[in-house]
Amino acid sequence: MQTKNNNIFYHLVAFLTVAIWGTTFVSTKVLMLNGLSPAQIFTLRFSIAYVLMLAFNHRRLFADSWQDEAKMALLGITGGSLYFCSENEAMNFTTTTNTSLIVCSCPLFATLLVRLVYKDSNRIHIVQLLGSLLAFVGMIIVVLNGRFVLHLSPVGDALAFTACMCWAIYSLLMKSTTGDYSPAFITRKVFFYGVLTILPYYIFIPGFPPLEVFTRPQVFGNLLFLGCLASMICFLTWNWCISKLGTVKATNCVYFNPITTMIFASWVLGEQITPYFLAGAACILIGMYVADKKTRGES
C-alpha cells in the first residue's frame, strides 16, 4: 500500500511538472514580444536557475570521474542548449503543429531507446508499448484538434526531430546517472552545461536588449517564472521523478503536455475545447494508464 501511494505521489509530481511546462509558451511569447530572442530567453532562465541551485547545492562541484562529468555535459546539451535551440529554430521553418507533433512524440522514442539499450525482454512489455502508442495517437488528436493540415518542411521537421531525440536521450542518460548522484547535483550540472554550450551562439548573433527592457514588470516577472519555477524547480522535480519512476513511466507523462497547453490556452486565450480534444485526452490518459500498469521491469 505504501509503495502504491508513493507511486501515485510520484506521478502527481510528474504531471504537475509537465503541466507547468505546458504553460511556459505564454511567458516565452511575452518575452519575445518585448525583444528577447529564444536563445536569450534560454540563457537567462538557465542562468537564473543555475545561480539559485548553486546557492543550495555547492559542496560538490565535480562528478567522480571525467566520464561522469562528460555525461553531465551531455545532459546539459540534450536537455538544455541543443533541445531548446532546435525546438525554437524548427518553428522558423515549419508550423507550430508540426513541431508539437514531432517533439511531443519523444516518449515513444524514449521507450524504444530503453528497449534497444536494455535488451532483456522484461524491460518493455508489449502491452506497455501498445499503451504508449495509444497515448501517442491521443497526443496527435489533441495537437491537430480536428484540423489535419500538415506542411512538410525537411529542415524544420529535422530540427523538431532533433529536439525530440534530445529529450529522449536526456531521459535515458538521466536513468543511468541518478543512481550515482543526487537529483540536485545533476540538475545544477544540467544548468551549468546548458548555459556553457549556448555561448557559441553569441559569436554569430551577439548582444542582448538594452537594460531598460529588463526593468519592465512583465519581463522581470516572466524571467523569474521561467528561471525559478519552470527551470530550477521543474527540472529538479523531473529528474527526481525519473529516479523514482524510471525513464518510460516518467517520460510518458510528456504526452500530457498538449492537454495542459490546450486547457491553459482555453483559459487565457479563449480557445475552444472541442470533442477532438476530449477524445484525444481520453486516449492519452488510458494509454498512460495501460503503459504504467505494465511497466514492471523498469524502475
Task: Describe the role of every protein-language-model region.
Residues 1-40, 77, 150-179, 198-200, ...:
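Glycine-/small-residue-enriched transmembrane alpha-helix faces in small-molecule transporters
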Residues 6-10, 34-39, 43, 64-70, ...:
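Juxtamembrane helix-entry segments on the extracytoplasmic side of multipass membrane proteins
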Residues 12, 41-44, 80, 84, ...:
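Helix-helix packing/entry segments at the starts of transmembrane helices
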Residues 23, 27-30, 49-65, 116, ...:
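Membrane-interface helix-cap regions at the ends of transmembrane helices
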Residues 24-25, 54-103, 140-141, 227-245:
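Specific transmembrane alpha-helical segments of multi-pass solute transporters/efflux pumps
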Residues 28, 33-82, 107-114, 165-173, ...:
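Transmembrane alpha-helices of multi-pass small-molecule transport proteins
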Residues 31, 41, 90, 116-119, ...:
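Hydrophobic/aromatic residues within transmembrane alpha-helices
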Residues 53, 73, 105-107, 113, ...:
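Hydrophobic transmembrane alpha-helices of multi-pass small-molecule transport proteins
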